[in-house]
Amino acid sequence: MADMPISNNAMATCLWFDKQSEEAAGLYCDLFPDSQIREVTRAPGDYPGGKSGDVLTVDFTVLGRPFLALNGGPDAGFTDAVSFQVFTDTQEETDRYWDALLADGGEPMMCSWLKDRFGVRWQIVPRVLMEGLRHPDSATRERVFAAMGEMQKIDHAGIEAAIDG
C-alpha cells in the first residue's frame, strides 16, 4: 500500500488506457529514475467491462511526478496535442529512453517526438538542444533549428556542430 494516496497531491496526471495500465506503468517505472508503482487498485467485483480482480487503476510516479493510469476501455485515446518532455544530458541517456519507448511497436516522429506502443506521446529532449534554441546569437538559433528539423531522435553531436557553426 502506498505511503501517501495519490489524492494527497495537489494535482496528478491521469492516463486512460484500454487495459494496459499496469504494463505501461511498469515500463515507465523501470525506465526512468525516481519512479515507482505505488498502488494497484483491483475491481472488488464483476462489472459490465470486466470481472473481479481486474486492474482498475495504477498509482505511480515517473521522475518524481504523480500519475494515475486508468483501465477505462477503448473509448479514449492519446493525441499529439499532449506529450511528456523528458530532458537528457548525454547521447547515451537520449538513446536509452528513445529506444526503450519505441520498443515493441512505438513510432518515431520528427524533432525528438515519439509515440510509444501504448500511444502515449513523448519528447526526448537533450538539454544541448534547448541551449542552442535559446542561444543569444540568432544565426546559431537558426542553425540549431534547421538541424533539429532534419532529425527524429536528436543527435547531440549534430546539435553541438550547429551551435559551433
Language model regions located:
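Short aromatic/hydrophobic contact patches that present stacked aromatics
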Residues: 12-14, 57, 83-85
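Terminal, contiguous helix-loop blocks that mediate binding/assembly
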Residues: 145-161
